[in-house]
UniProtKB/Swiss-Prot annotation:
Residue range(s) of DNA binding per entry: 133-152
Protein name, UniProt field: HTH-type transcriptional regulator DctR
GO function term, MF aspect, one: DNA binding
InterPro entries: Sig_transdc_resp-reg_C-effctor, Tscrpt_reg_LuxR_C, WH-like_DNA-bd_sf
UniProt organism field: Escherichia coli O157:H7
Disulfide bond residue pairs: none
Lineage, uppermost ranks: Bacteria, Pseudomonadati, Pseudomonadota, Gammaproteobacteria, Enterobacterales
Length: 176
């Protein structure tokens, strides 16, 4: 069984056609996940305009104990699903490489441009969603010094001179 988590109906249709050999289920919100029915599924997540990280959605996915998770994202997030095997791929992956990845064969999938820790991605998502510093500190339960440290590291990784340049960053749509 394949669970396709996306808000993009064109993406789902493409995945359904590629994965025609199996049972393909479209998931748009966390209420549609059935922990018993979808146990040990193969999960494919599209994060474009659908940032499921750091939410109950990801917790639900972890409870499914998926066989493998493929995440379409320009970010590589370290240990985002604990011990569940995760592969990050760009949306520009070829169909041949994607099918090889699904079948467990070797494919030359390019690595994500940006590699972040879970906390860095969480801070970055909060900043992209225009949360105030105080709200971020309260939500993530971190100190101001830790926040500034994460913010500095994120700016270095994304090659930003000022944090307000983030709104024009090429991957901003994957954070909201």
């Amino acid at each position: 069984m394949f669970l396709i988590i996306t808000r993009d109906t064109m993406f789902f249709t493409a995945m359904k056609n590629i994965l025609s050999k199996g049972n393909v289920v479209h998931i748009q919100n966390e209420e549609e996940i059935d922990v018993m029915l979808h146990q040990n599924a193969f999960v494919i997540i599209d994060t474009l305009m659908n940032n499921v990280f750091h939410s109950n959605f990801l917790t639900q996915i972890e409870r499914l104990k998926p066989v493998h998770v493929i995440i379409f994202s320009p970010f590589n997030i370290k240990r985002c699903l604990g011990k569940v095997p995760v592969t990050f791929v760009p949306r520009t992956i070829t169909i041949i490489d994607f099918v090889a990845l699904i079948n467990g064969s070797y494919c030359s999938v390019p690595e994500a441009n940006v590699s972040l820790s879970r906390k860095q991605h969480q801070v970055l998502s909060c900043i992209a969603n225009q949360m105030t510093t105080e709200d971020i500190l309260e939500k993530l339960k971190i100190s101001l010094k830790t926040f500034y440290c994460h913010k500095h590291n994120i700016m270095m990784i994304l090659n930003l001179k000022r944090i307000n340049e983030l709104v024009r960053h090429q991957h901003i749509d994957y954070l909201v």
